[in-house]
Amino acid sequence: MKGKIPLAKLRKNRLFKVLSLALTLVILTGIFAGCGKEPEEETTTTTPPTTQAPTTEPYVTRSINPLTGEGNYPEELLKNRPVMISVENHKDARPQWGITDADIVWEMEAEGGITRMLLMFADASRIPEQVGPTRSARHYFVELVEGFDAIFVHFGGSPQAYNALDNHGTDHIDGMSDSGTFARDTSRNVSSEHRAYTTGEKVMKAIENKDFRTTLEDEYVNPFKFNTSPTKLEDGTCNQMVVAFSSYATYTYTYSEEDNLYYSSLNGNRFNDSDGNQQNFTNLIICYADKSSLGDKKGRISLDLSEGNGVYVSNGTYQEITWEKGDYSDMMKFYDADGKELSLNTGRTYIGIVASSRESECTIS
């Protein structure tokens, strides 16, 4: 970064200064000793000066939730793998279970303008008693999951999704083959595909039964940086953000100065969970991605997750950003206009991946 000295160079300069000072002291000692009266039959032994190698402060792991930045997170969970659960957003699936409990909510189109959410939990123990309705996977869901070293929970999938799961060896729990991990809610008068759900206890049991690795890979780096205090963004004011996935799913996020949260409405109606709680977030990240058709009879699509532009909204303000994912198993990262990694305000985050063709319909006011 411009204006900063690399750590290795800084250490080298410090060591050079210490050695130079030590050599000067030795020379001065010799000069003053030569000028004084030499003691009779006395020998002196000069001990060479020693220098202490530069030290660095030990790294201290803060016990914060790696997905929200919130404190008092159990330290024993810091190295555990996150879990991502596919939840549908068809009108017959609403209100959903557990969406306001997720640390991060991802959302993107499945097909026909209908969106699907990936509820992301920092650890399986954070999954509530009921989550759903769980629904099928898409191949670009798997691509996101892979980047976060997450365990994936879904109920079925497209042919492309199953190919991706097999090709990448993704640890996943599928309602089509792991029926004991899921149940059907009997209180709703809708077709069965809109009633499947799971629980935190069932997911943890399935992870144990499948002998999945529960800790993160050694090279894993936490996905987000967080500000130490609430921060305003530099591009302008955002009291309301419209996120237009399609005519079927258009959200309005309205800022509340009372609690610094953005509250969600879907197609003009409050977007509540099954407990009547309105969906709300501290951070909104909207990513614009190129969308293409797979050309099958189901109308399935693909989203290019390699890179793109977007907007970050928080604390009544916004700023334009860029994002990139790179290779299939790379983590999606977010950057400000200067190319520095984005730093979020502490709290829950919504990440919407919207077709680039809809960017002009996503407005800020």
Model regions and ranges:
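Bacterial N-terminal signal peptides that target proteins for export
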Residues: I5, K9-L21
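Short linear motifs in intrinsically disordered/low-complexity regions
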Residues: R14, E41-T43, L284, K291
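Hydrophobic alpha-helical membrane-embedded or membrane-associated segments
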Residues: L21-L28
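C-terminal motif of bacterial Sec signal peptides marking the signal peptidase cleavage site
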Residues: G30-G34
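Bacterial signal peptide processing site
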Residues: G36-E38
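Low-complexity, acidic Ser/Thr/Pro-rich repeat tracts that form intrinsically disordered stalk/linker regions
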Residues: E42-T56
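A surface/extracellular/periplasmic glyco- and lipid-processing/surface-interacting theme
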Residues: Q52-W106, E111-S365
